[in-house]
């Protein structure tokens, strides 16, 4: 699984 470190909830 890969998740962006730039992820921002919204």
Curated annotation (Swiss-Prot):
Keyword check for Cell cycle, yes or no: no
Question: Which GO terms of the cellular component aspect does the record hold?
Answer: extracellular region
The record's disulfide annotation reads none
Write out the entry's keywords from A to Z.
Amidation, Hormone, Pyrrolidone carboxylic acid, Secreted
The organism's superkingdom is given as: Eukaryota
PTM-bearing positions, type Glycine amide: 10
Name its cellular compartments: Secreted
Q: Does the keyword Secreted apply?
A: yes
GO MF entries: hormone activity
- List residues modified as Pyrrolidone carboxylic acid: 1
What function is annotated for this protein? Stimulates the secretion of gonadotropins; it stimulates the secretion of both luteinizing and follicle-stimulating hormones.
Q: Which family does it belong to?
A: Belongs to the GnRH family.
Protein's name in the database? Gonadoliberin-1
Q: Which organism is it from?
A: Petromyzon marinus
């Amino acid at each position: 699984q890969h998740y962006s470190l730039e992820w921002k909830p919204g």
